Swiss-Prot record:
Substrate binds at residues 65, 110-114, 171, 176, 245-246. It is a peripheral membrane protein. Belongs to the dihydroorotate dehydrogenase family. Type 2 subfamily. This is Dihydroorotate dehydrogenase (quinone). Its main location: membrane. NCBIfam families: PRK05286.1-1 (NF003644), PRK05286.1-2 (NF003645), PRK05286.1-4 (NF003646), PRK05286.2-5 (NF003652), pyrD_sub2 (TIGR01036). GO terms for cellular component: cytoplasm; plasma membrane.
Length: 343
């Protein structure tokens, strides 16, 4: 069924297709119909960040920026759903066109630029949703907020989403907001993490529960830079790391239509680069901090490869666009087939 739907959707522009798909998934969720689209994955519970996940395969942030279809995505069988990236104030993002399909490479290039309706709108949608499973909320800074004041935006968002999230992801790795990736390094990272940790402690006391914080990093770092990030995450008491966001590299899409468009590349071409980051992180973290792997999962075996590399959970986005809901079950089954000692 999804193959037919994809053929029709791919005749539309990528952003129109995205918006229509989101509307349909949202409507299906409200009517309770989405469970009919694919067989529910087997139960494969896993405990990560002190949370109990029904299975380790989640929806990556970016597909549902405003929380418009939380119930719909949950009904498809995801073990957890991450929405956002959301910013303190609404913003339109970059000019269109800003999403490009590269079907021969099972890839997507986007330069969306954190287009969203703002954190207050997102919170209202979360409150209206029926879903009571694991919900991640991904937060970022507004385009016109100077990088030097980015911490203010993250703290505003953290304050507002804290009571409504199972965990919060701090996005410092989108390539489509100028200067954002500089927050991954050196004193900028340490100052941000320190501020987040202090605010997390305050909010824990205020709300009576500790909401884990995950940091989402880019795939375009050297091993040495990745090790430094890992050390900073441990030192600051963060709860998880998500590896990775999209890449600025164009390896694997050279010469393809739209292959030279500006923006972040996701899908199959980022798989090896992302998995390498997971391996480096796993070696440095040595189990002290869980890894959530994202990047290039287009088949179930790719999810298993991420787990084998050291991840505890995986997320899909571009693979979901190309393969549909069946990829969720396929990924859960592939992980379930791994020897327990490996997963």
């Amino acid at each position: 069924m999804y193959n037919l739907a994809r053929q029709l959707l791919f005749k539309l522009s990528p952003e129109t297709s995205h918006d229509l798909s989101l509307d349909l998934i949202g409507a299906g969720g409200r009517l309770g119909l989405n469970g009919l689209l694919s067989k529910s994955p087997a139960k494969l519970p896993v405990s990560v960040m002190g949370l109990e996940f029904p299975n380790p395969v989640g929806l990556a942030a970016g597909l549902d920026k405003n929380g418009a279809a939380i119930d719909g995505f949950a009904q498809l069988g995801f073990g957890f759903v991450e929405i956002g990236t959301v910013t303190p104030r609404p913003q339109p993002g970059n000019p269109k066109p800003r999403i490009f399909r590269l079907p021969h490479a099972e890839a997507i290039i986007n330069r969306m630029g954190f287009n969203n309706l703002g954190v207050d709108n997102l919170v209202s949608r979360v409150q209206a949703a029926k879903y009571r499973g694991i919900l991640g909320i991904n937060i970022g800074k507004n385009f016109d907020t100077p990088v030097e004041r980015a911490v203010d935006d993250y703290l505003i968002c953290l304050d507002k989403v804290y009571a409504h999230a199972s965990y919060v992801t701090v996005n410092v790795s989108s390539p489509n907001t100028p200067g954002l990736r500089s927050l991954q390094f050196g004193d900028s990272l340490k100052q941000l993490l320190q501020a987040l940790s202090l605010r997390q402690q305050e909010l824990t006391q205020r709300h009576g529960r500790r909401v884990p914080l995950a940091i989402k990093i880019a795939p375009d770092m050297s091993d040495e830079e990745t090790v430094l990030v890992a050390s900073a995450l441990i030192e600051s008491g963060m709860d998880a790391v998500i590896a990775t966001n999209t890449t600025l590299s164009r390896q694997g899409v050279e010469g393809l239509p739209h292959g030279d468009e500006a923006g972040g590349l996701s899908g199959a071409p980022v798989r090896e680069k992302s998995t390498h980051i997971v391996k480096v992180l796993a070696g440095e973290l040595a189990g002290r901090l869980p890894i959530i792997a994202a990047g290039g999962i287009t088949e179930g075996r790719h999810a298993a490869e991420k787990i084998a590399a050291g991840a505890s959970l995986v997320q899909i986005y571009s693979g979901f666009i190309y393969k549909g809901p069946a990829l969720i079950r396929e990924s859960v089954d592939a992980i379930a087939a791994m020897p327990p000692a490996v997963r």
